[in-house]
Amino acid sequence: MPIIYLSPSTQENNLYVTGGSEEEWMNRLADAMIPYLDASGIQYVRNTPDMTASSSIRASNAGNYDLHLALHSNASAPANYGRTRGIIVFYYPGSTRGRRAAEIVADNLKAIYPLPNRVRTEATTSIGEVRQPRAPSVFLELVPQ
């Protein structure tokens, strides 16, 4: 049975123009995912809001996970609030399993996002939650705040 490390954002100071924070909304998203993970037989361990990105990575690396899934939302400059759209699904270059997971996530998001041509995968080495987990990792930058 697959097991993932679910890592919603811990950025409580990254505030949304519409209210709340990235930490709050990404934790709500993780909460909403739980019944679907359970129904699909996917086990998970999850970070907590009092953790940091670094402690989330350490916790992920302390386990034996099939995937590290980080949930984030893309920041937008105040002048662009409500105008910038799209989703980026990051993975580590050279990670075949990470890339495959990113492609699966992106394909499923394209099916539900109103602008499927704005959903893409991208390799990166600059994001800690992509570069440092031992498990294949996917880092979602969802619709801008």
Could you describe each region identified by the protein language model?
Residues R46-T48, V119-E122:
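A structural preference for short, hydrophobic beta-strand core positions in alpha/beta folds
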Residues Y36-D38, Y81, Q132:
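A generic structural signal for short, solvent-exposed coil/turn residues
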Residues R85, P116, A123-S126:
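Glycine-rich, flexible loop/turn motifs
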Residues M1-I57, R85:
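Active-site histidine-acidic residue metal-binding/catalytic motifs
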Residues N13-W25, A75-D107:
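A short, glycine/acidic-enriched catalytic loop
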Residues D31-I42, A62, A106-P114:
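Sec-exported extracytoplasmic/periplasmic mature domains
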Residues G41, G86, N117, R134-P136:
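A generic structural signal for alpha->beta connector loops
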Residues P2-T18, R58-G63, H68-A77, T121-Q145:
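Active-site-adjacent mobile loop/cap segments within catalytic or ligand-binding domains
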